[in-house]
């Protein structure tokens, strides 16, 4: 399963969707199919489209802020295998806040996180993930410049590499899922 945490998911354009809760694949599919939806981030739109084209392979969901994700996971058993994490938010969240939210997610999950952001943030993000508190999570973090041609393929290739070379990534979520279902 893949989860986007990105404020550019255009769910707030429709009053009948709650942009503070989980946005499931059906809602994302609606947003993609509705011609009136204004996707300000075409890279995120294309990534969602590609994921939704393979429903047997991918389960997709989204949140419009890391705080909404953290709130949701405190009340619900939810652990995506991959998070596509945007660094900047129009809500005015400072880099420090984005950094703390990322650290909270890393500490409370076993999720692989692709920080997928604009070029002007990449150097700052790379400096953040080199900090001592992030070093132990380096195998679960990858920084990708959203504006790089083929950036979506870099994420897909990164996921495929983890599936092939990392036992925990390949089987860990199945074990955790089955354990949670048994409880």
Give a label for each model feature.
Residues 1-183:
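Extended charged low-complexity segments that act as oligomerization/scaffolding linkers
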